[in-house]
């Protein structure tokens, strides 16, 4: 199952805003009983200006945009049950989306793109780990961003014979 990582988004708190009301409570004797006079609405004001609200809105929008840009496709190297597999083994990403391959177990793994199963013009050595380089510990990662649309076949060099292969599509 794929996981998506993202940046933390902080949403501003409005707990500092206070309602300003008259400190002197009005009683029936201080309220005009005249039905012909128009009553003024109560004087309520927020101790925050429109400018402050605008700054908060812009900051919130910027946080959301930055968090969206920080999203990445996460692929586990090794399943939770110990199987030698990429999880997911087939997936699709957008052109320019970051892909994070994460070692899910203590087995040594790597990510090598098959030069015969990538779009023409793409250099497999520039997007692959070296076949002798390994992610040895759980949590270690390898990141790649693919910009050329097409299908990409990849494998784990130490476990390719055991069927640890995958395929991704860049749209």
From Swiss-Prot:
Segments forming domain Plastocyanin-like: 73-171
Keywords: Chloroplast, Copper, Electron transport, Membrane, Metal-binding, Plastid, Thylakoid, Transit peptide, Transport
Alphabetical list of InterPro entries matching this protein: BlueCu_1, BlueCu_1_BS, Copper_blue_Plastocyanin, Cupredoxin, Plastocyanin
Location (main, coarse): plastid
Membrane topology: Peripheral membrane protein
Function field: Participates in electron transfer between P700 and the cytochrome b6-f complex in photosystem I. Seems to be a minor plastocyanin in Arabidopsis.
Family: Belongs to the plastocyanin family.
This protein's name: Plastocyanin minor isoform, chloroplastic
